């Protein structure tokens, strides 16, 4: 009987630890960070590619970036309002995204955009993906 009680208490404690938010370690969730750029109408593909390459280089310079995809709008709906180039980053978790934002390499990239004659504007959306 004593062994049964000991097993019951052990299992109960394990269940409480696994399902109590205060006791169990919280699972780090990835964060998606989408940036969409509008370039000037006279921007050449070479100029845009230089900006894209500089942006892509951040994944090797800043820890916590686990994925980086780029693409060009190909929607036939005509509702992109001049925004054409999409950059989708995945961060390990919110802490990685929060460390990325003020990172010196990210600041250098932002300075490159501010000084670029082809960059017009961007917008950014971050989210934690759920099914």
Go through the PLM ranges and name each one:
Residues 7-18:
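Bacterial N-terminal signal peptides
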Residues 4-9, 25-28, 70-81, 111-131:
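Glycine-rich beta-strand-turn "strand-cap" elements at beta-sheet edges
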Residues 20-24:
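Sec/Tat signal peptide C-region and signal peptidase I cleavage site
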Residues 45-86:
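N-terminal, post-signal-peptide region of Sec/Tat-exported proteins
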Residues 32, 48, 52-55, 94, ...:
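Extracytoplasmic/secreted envelope proteins and their assembly/folding machinery
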Residues 60-65, 81, 90-125:
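An amphipathic, aromatic/His-enriched active-site/gating alpha helix that lines ligand/cofactor pockets
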Residues 30-39, 70, 74-101:
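Short, well-ordered beta-strand segments in beta-rich or mixed alpha/beta enzyme
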